[in-house]
Amino acid sequence: MEEEEPEIRELQRPGKGTNTRIPGHDRTHICQAIAELRGALGEESISTDDEDLQSHGYSEWSSINSERLPVAVAYPKTTEEVSRIAKVCSKYRMPMVPYSGGSSLEGNFSAPHGGMCIDFVFMDKILALHDEDMDVVVQPAVQWMHLNDQIKHAGLFFPVDPGPSAKIGGMVGTCCSGTNAVKYGTMKNWVINLTVVLADGRIIKTRRRPRKTSAGYNLTGLFVGAEGTLGIVTEITLQLAVIPEVTTVGVVSFPSIRHAASAAMQAIRMSLPVQAMEIMDEVQMGVINRAGGTGKTWKEVPTLFFKFAGTKAGVKESISLAQSIAKANSGENFQFSKGEQEMHALWSARKEALWSMVSLRKGAEQIWSTDVAVPISRLADIIGMHILQP
């Protein structure tokens, strides 16, 4: 009896007329690759379901979506299974796209040439915590907030804090940052080593666990930020930080975006010891009020958010310096949290910004979200350009 050929549909991305066929790739080869992987990993390990393909190739909150979708989604459970997937895809010349949290706003998991999406949903374990060495070994689908919940008993935390739903694999692939970047830097500063499956299925480890090494090339740095183009990351060893004795949040309002930007620049030049510093204009503050997700009505003016962390004495001194800088730049209505609950309430305005905009969409309106980078001296200019040219 002949084996039934896997069903490959001509799916379209929402609003587009382009199908998922891979240019220059034979349909028979695609079917053979899927059948071979199902035989090796199990029928349930490879999906060609319409909804799976849509959800793994398109994001409604991203302004950058490919016109194509993957032709199949693989669900490996081990590094060895990822290696097997890579070998088969290499054999049949199928592109591969790794997928962890799907929270990208920049089209990082889109499949412009179709191919195989590799979803790490079943590789979500914390493999080892070395509290004395202050590091942890995780799989790519571990969510960073869940990681911090699991290791806080050791007095440690992972300080890179992008969107709440982000997972470690995608954070490595994009070399992400977050609000804590002012003090702790970005993802590349916290990755010790990686286990990587190369395009032909070979498995490599980029380096050993000791912090200091001068043996060989900096392969770890090569893969961090490569977005899966050089290999598929299946295991990550992360450096951890000590949970600060005290953490508090401060919020201050300004009459204009230039006043707020000037205060931010002065804070950096004076080495104000903050864990995070974020600026939001009057438009964003108004959006947050209309969405109503923070449980607080905010003054709709340019606003700076500070997060202070350290010893009690150090935080007290930092708050005093921040107040002086704000006052010198016409800042007013300075608030700072007096407990953990109030701290989360104040900081929620920054974290809820994107979701507030999403909730206020009308009909088929799209949210255009992206990152821009300018020298700190041009911060006010770039925000001003956005306001003048909405």
Label for each model-derived stretch:
Residues M1-K87, K91, S104-M134, Q284-G293, ...:
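N-terminal flexible segment immediately upstream of the FAD-binding catalytic core
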Residues P98-G102, F109, F120, P140, ...:
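Glycine-rich, histidine-containing beta strand-loop boundary motifs that form or position
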Residues K125-E278:
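FAD-binding subdomain of flavoenzyme oxidoreductases
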Residues D26-I34, Y75, T79-V82, P140-L147, ...:
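Generic structural signal for well-ordered, non-membrane alpha-helical segments
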Residues E3-I8, S47-G57, V242, T248, ...:
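C-terminal substrate-recognition/cap domain of FAD-linked oxidoreductases
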